[in-house]
Structure formats: C-alpha cells, structure tokens
C-alpha cells in the first residue's frame, strides 16, 4: 500500500486536487534524519510578500518560426490515449486549459479528446511514430504537417526512452486496443500495440540532431527529446556534436526522465535496475549544458515521481526550467494506486476502456481537480521559494 507512493504523498495530492487546506498540526511526520534527506535552506530574512510576484513566462525555441512561451513550471507529462481512457484525457485536457499548463499527448498519437479541452499540447513522437509514421518505421512528413497545423500543438518531443522501461518500447495490451485507438495509431484492432525499442532511423547522436532539425523545419515549432540518462558520458558527446554542427542544430529542450518513472507497465528488471534516477541525472544534465555554454539555448524539463511541492521545488533548484508529472495527475483524477493500470480493470476508470468502470470519472468534475492540483502546487512551491529568500520559484538555486 505504501509503494511506490506513500500515504502522505498521495494524501497531499488528493487534498490539493479537492482544493482543501493542506495545513497540518503537531509537526512533521517525515523522518528528517537519513543522509541525503531533501531539505531547503531557509533565509534568515525571507522575501516579503510585497516583494514576490508571478512567475514570468519562459520561451522555448526562440529561434523557431513559432516559439512557445509558458509561465507554468508545472505541467502534465506524457500519457497516451489508449494507456488512459477517454474521460481521463478529456479531464486532463480541460483541466490543463483551466490551469494554464501544457499537456503531453504521449506516444499514441493526437486524439480528438486531447484537442477538445483546448489546452496547449506537446506532441510526442515515440519510436513507433504513431500518428505521424509511414508504416515502415520512418516519418510521414505530410501527416506530421497535419498535426503541426493544429494551433494547440505547441511543441514536439522525440521520445528516446521513458523512466519505466529505458531500452524497451511501449506496450499497449490488446484488451485496450479499441477500434478508435487502432485508427488513431494506425494499427490492427485487438492486438498488442508494441513500439520498437528505439527509432529505426536514429542510430547515433548526429542522426538524433538531424531528426530534430527535420521535425522543427517541417513544423516551425520547438522540438526536443526525452530520455532516461544511462551513461553520463554521452552528454559530453551530445554537447560536442551540437557545438560541431552549430547552435542551430541544438534541441530546443531536453526532458530528463527518472528511472523511477512509471506510468507505463514494464518488466521488473527494467523498473528496478536500469537507468539513472532523477536525483543523479538532472544535476549532470544541467551541469554539462552549463559547462559547454548551452544552458541558455536548451530548456530543461524534469519528470519522474515529482508529485509534491518539495520534489518540484527541488527540481527547480537543481536547474530544471519546467517539471512534468504523470502519476500526480492520476492521483488528482482519483487513482487509488491499485496497480492495475495494464489490465484494463482500473477501478477509478482512468486506465480502462470498460464503460462500466469509467462511469465514476466525470470529466467536468475531474477537470476542476486537475486545475486545483496545478494551482495549489504552484502556490506551495512559491511558499518554499519565499521561505528561501527567492521572489519566485524559478529563482531557487542549489
């Protein structure tokens, strides 16, 4: 019951999503003694409330034809329609619009329900290229342009790997491949939807940069990539290749996913043993970008088990520009951590396509909970920032 998220972590999200007071009496229940415990250094003279202000927008891809400016440092991470249900996607897309944050489509393509909410969208290009593929493992430029023509689609994210299963492609079980989902993805109905373990046309760093440049040129929109860091030495190779080719070759952002990410079901051998956790990888990515003079060119997005204000504030301190969460938003929708995500039997109606189980998930009601979760997250991260002497959360430093 206490793993992977303990009762206190879940309770904070539930209360925040319901817009309830999260004030607690009688001291912390968190054990502050273990080495490595996350603690913030409060300022002797903290920032006065009169000196604080709203978070300013950050621009992603300023050199693009259509750069994107976002003021929200907390956003919805990648979860595809198929992995989660129609009412869940509707609730998230509507809630994201209300909260003024973005929503990542996940690798399953662009569905009508992503668009219905009116939120800003990040279109993820997974290894199977669902929705923009040519059927042979390559990119269909015409289909890509069709997706980019939607004004709601603001960014494109090339997925190299994800926290739950670095080195392995995504799997959507046959029970969840409905006719509608099959049509959106361009796959057979009622068969397992399996993505390759990597993009067939991206075999090295130069090819990655070339692919990003191609997508950005075709769409006119900021393009980056998502990965779980394995070998930190590869970061040097990436930075050197960018410098060799010129700054115009650089990705507009890098999404650093933690090895303990987990919206996708995966073999336990990958869940438990492969990839670096965000506590190890995020500082390395930020430091390498600074070392090579690329930090101002490339935005950094952190994801992976960041569901409470302290964890989000930590990521901003370390150097992330934005934080994405997936499971935090599942809790906001009513997830009870029943661990049935891949079985089409989710009792909360979030990861099932069974209409009977979906009846308890009202998209309008849950959209408000998504909104409250984002707003309360931003508010409490700001409280931490002010206690540390920072006027806004993005001024936090390690």
Q: Which sequence ranges carry the predicted segments?
A:
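Conserved, well-structured core domains of diverse proteins
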Residues: 1-104, 108-118, 124-164, 173, ...
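Alpha/beta catalytic cores of nucleotide-metabolism and tRNA/nucleoside-modifying enzymes
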Residues: 1-42, 273, 284-297, 307-313, ...
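Active-site mouth loops of central-metabolism enzymes
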Residues: 75-85, 127-137, 169-171, 195-204, ...
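Internal alpha/beta core interface subdomains
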Residues: 90, 99, 150-153, 172, ...
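Flexible, glycine/charged-enriched surface loops at secondary-structure junctions
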Residues: 106-108, 221-226, 251, 295, ...
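Glycine-rich tight-turn/loop motif centered on a GG-T
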Residues: 123, 129-131, 174-203, 264-279, ...
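Carboxylate/His-rich catalytic cores and anion/metal-binding grooves
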Residues: 148-173, 232-233, 237-252, 256
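Glycine-rich phosphate/ribose-binding loops and adjacent secondary-structure elements
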Residues: 194-358
